[in-house]
Amino acid sequence: MYNETPIKRRPSTRIYVGNVPIGDGAPIAVQSMTNTKTTDVEATIAQIRALEKVGADIVRVSVPTMDAAEAFKLIKQAVNVPLVADIHFDYRIALKVAEYGVDCLRINPGNIGNEERIRSVVECARDHNIPIRIGVNGGSLEKDLMDKYKEPTPQALLESAMRHVDILDRLNFDQFKVSVKASDVFLAVESYRLLAKQIRQPLHLGITEAGGARAGSVKSAVGLGMLLAEGIGDTLRISLAADPVEEIKVGFDILKSLRIRSRGINFIACPSCSRQEFDVISTVNELERRLEDVTTAMDVSIIGCVVNGPGEALVSHIGLTGGHNKSGYYDEGERQKERFDNDNIVDSLEAKIRAKASQMANRIQIKDTTE
């Protein structure tokens, strides 16, 4: 199976968010953010666990008040995934959640306050061995930058980021990552390109406020795909007006499509036409639903006829090619004698995929123990 990626990652420094390495060649971390009221501890914990179940490496939680900070303490004690506290306006909240074991502090240069407040946050982060994310956003730039540039521009986002990078440099603090997000794809992409040339710290990617599930996924895939293909980016979040679980799925799908990082099954499926010998669309949809729990990276081709089916099956771990009444089954590119009844394809294919995933996972485990 062809699984090489031509992408060469941008060199960067290494930080840790909890036990998750960021930068310096580490796997690109996929993040999301809770959309519950943080003071609703039970609901927030449930959402974090749902995110962790689908593969979230890191979860960000908004902490807008001191009451939310107290709730954060309870939330942190109940979950395993590293948590980032999202801090705006009141720097004292950052100091409080640091006491409660937060794994990373996100501060917004546009509203966190003057240099003295930033110094307080940095010294607290240093004392607790916590990294910081400088999170610039085109929708909340500092007033003087808006006066200077009249609107969010790549140069404005870069200047906002660099003035705070300079502050952290003066304070001899290097445990940080930076983001320069915007809702416009080209604005965000150019901002990240400029920033990538200026610093060596890890970059957190995102198209902010991208939109609903469909449009937001497309916008994020285009913008982040451009950057990732250039080797830019060490962690990412897909911002959707949708269930945060979908953000994680889309994030992994983008990385999977670029062969940067794979988790779970990569379905290769035809859009179907009158040549299909079974219902391709319903088959793929049902298998995606049933096999969400499979984390082994593997390619599965499901093609409704013999035009492209055999060719796709040759480069898949498991392949299915539509045939009259019964469809052909391939394992590691080799046609098997066994054929699947078209009326029972989903059950048959699910069993084969699960067995293959288990076999591949065991193979990887054995390899790891012998190296």
Swiss-Prot record:
Cofactor note: Binds 1 [4Fe-4S] cluster.
Pfam families according to UniProt: GcpE
One MF term in the entry's GO annotations: 4-hydroxy-3-methylbut-2-en-1-yl diphosphate synthase activity (ferredoxin)
Catalytic activity reported: (2E)-4-hydroxy-3-methylbut-2-enyl diphosphate + oxidized [flavodoxin] + H2O + 2 H(+) = 2-C-methyl-D-erythritol 2,4-cyclic diphosphate + reduced [flavodoxin]
Cofactor: [4Fe-4S] cluster
Keyword presence, Signal: no
Record keyword Lipid metabolism present: no
Broad class of enzyme this protein falls into: oxidoreductase
Function per UniProt: Converts 2C-methyl-D-erythritol 2,4-cyclodiphosphate (ME-2,4cPP) into 1-hydroxy-2-methyl-2-(E)-butenyl 4-diphosphate.
Family listed: Belongs to the IspG family.
The protein's name in its UniProt record: 4-hydroxy-3-methylbut-2-en-1-yl diphosphate synthase (flavodoxin)
